[in-house]
A protein has these predicted regions:
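Vicinal oxygen chelate
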Residues: 23-26, 33-90, 95-98, 115
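A short, polar/charged loop-to-alpha-helix boundary motif
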Residues: 98-113
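Short aromatic-enriched loop/helix-cap "lid" or pocket-rim segments at secondary-structure transitions
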Residues: 16, 43, 105-106
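Short amphipathic alpha-helical surface micro-motifs
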Residues: 1, 11-16, 31-35, 63-65
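Core segments of cupin and vicinal oxygen chelate
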Residues: 1-26, 84
């Protein structure tokens, strides 16, 4: 594994580090360091959450729902959603590329629980 990119984002006071396996830069792990030392939630296992890019966030969330997965934060904006793994790890889903057009039923769905 090697550091692909490292950058400081001064406006929101974080440092981002992207790690990738040699010869496979498509699969990255993003580590975020919060300069203010924000406390992690109970059961966080020392990290905030995992994130994955998906080709169509609406289709992906619908497939998850069809399998009984609860969407904690629906993709109302056509760009981002949150779910939790069976053992409580928060997982962020991000639309690959530009956000999709906002549409129903997603835009009216409410948040469920925490993420």
């Amino acid at each position: 594994m090697y550091v692909n990119i490292s950058s400081d984002v001064f406006i929101i006071k974080i440092t981002l580090i992207f790690l990738a396996a040699p010869n496979d830069e498509k699969a990255e792990i993003e580590l975020t360091y919060n300069w203010d030392g924000d406390e992690l939630g109970e059961g966080s296992r020392n990290f905030g959450h995992l994130a994955y890019r998906v080709d169509n966030i609406y289709d992906f969330c619908q497939k998850l729902m069809n399998y009984g997965v609860e969407i904690n934060r629906p993709p109302r904006d056509g760009n981002m959603a949150f779910i939790k793994s069976p053992d409580g790890i928060s997982i962020e889903l991000l639309q690959n590329g530009d956000p999709l057009e906002i549409k129903e039923p997603w835009s009216s769905m409410k948040n469920i629980g925490t993420w």
